[in-house]
């Protein structure tokens, strides 16, 4: 397989911790010839604290677990009906800068939402993607040895109420929205191919290999 191939793994609904561990192991073990990967996954309910996370932004987590993450940013929520897209790209090999990658991810979401006739925008003062001032997509990355990991979380068709237990991304009173509030009937299955197509376009990637095996043991994901 060519190192230029982009492998897409559809992992279905998974707990956060094992996926995070596998993502770190993939990143630590990859080499210059390892193809880039994107993992599409939904997570069971969890709050994750980024590297800059402050405890005061966790208002009342209640019965939802709080996990520490090494991504950038503050606290956010993951749950069923939210499309998480982990982006593991060798930036050096693809000659992509960090700012260029962030812009590509944000524009990927904007373009995907436009396919549902939803007008969205990124903001320079607050990373992510917004619809009428409400946040619809969170973004958090880390770069290690020239390779990215972590990624985006796009609210599609989920229970948004857990966001009220936190200051999302560290912003008190930040309102959240989701695609089905803007375009009823939207599904993760409809969103996934659009995210991949737009992301590949923005990074000029033409060789894409889709893998669909939600029961795939995480040890098999390691290179």
Swiss-Prot record:
Quote the subcellular location field of this record. Answer: Cytoplasm
Question: What's the protein name?
Answer: Octanoyltransferase
> What is this organism's lineage?
Bacteria, Pseudomonadati, Pseudomonadota, Gammaproteobacteria, Enterobacterales
| Alphabetically ordered keywords of this record | Acyltransferase, Cytoplasm, Transferase
Residues at the active site: 169 (acyl-thioester intermediate)
Question: Any idea which positions bind substrate?
Answer: 71-78, 138-140, 151-153
Any Pfam family:
LplA-B_cat
Is Acyltransferase set as a keyword in this record? yes
Question: Entry's InterPro entries?
Answer: aa-tRNA-synth_II/BPL/LPL, BPL_LPL_catalytic, Octanoyltransferase, Octanoyltransferase_CS
Membrane-spanning parts: none
Q: Where is this site: Lowers pKa of active site Cys?
A: 135
Q: Which domain of life is it from?
A: Bacteria
Also noted in the record is: In the reaction, the free carboxyl group of octanoic acid is attached via an amide linkage to the epsilon-amino group of a specific lysine residue of lipoyl domains of lipoate-dependent enzymes.
By its UniProt entry, which NCBIfam families does this protein fall under?
Answer: lipB, PRK14342.1
Known function: Catalyzes the transfer of endogenously produced octanoic acid from octanoyl-acyl-carrier-protein onto the lipoyl domains of lipoate-dependent enzymes. Lipoyl-ACP can also act as a substrate although octanoyl-ACP is likely to be the physiological substrate.
Q: Which reaction does it catalyse?
A: octanoyl-[ACP] + L-lysyl-[protein] = N(6)-octanoyl-L-lysyl-[protein] + holo-[ACP] + H(+)
Q: Which gene encodes it?
A: lipB
Q: List GO BP terms, alphabetically.
A: protein modification process
The text of the family note is: Belongs to the LipB family.
Q: Which pathway does the database say it acts in?
A: Protein modification; protein lipoylation via endogenous pathway; protein N(6)-(lipoyl)lysine from octanoyl-[acyl-carrier-protein]: step 1/2
GO MF annotations, alphabetized: lipoyl(octanoyl) transferase activity
Q: What is its EC number?
A: 2.3.1.181
Q: From what organism does this protein derive?
A: Erwinia tasmaniensis (strain DSM 17950 / CFBP 7177 / CIP 109463 / NCPPB 4357 / Et1/99)
Record-level GO cellular component terms: cytoplasm
Domain named BPL/LPL catalytic is located at 32-207
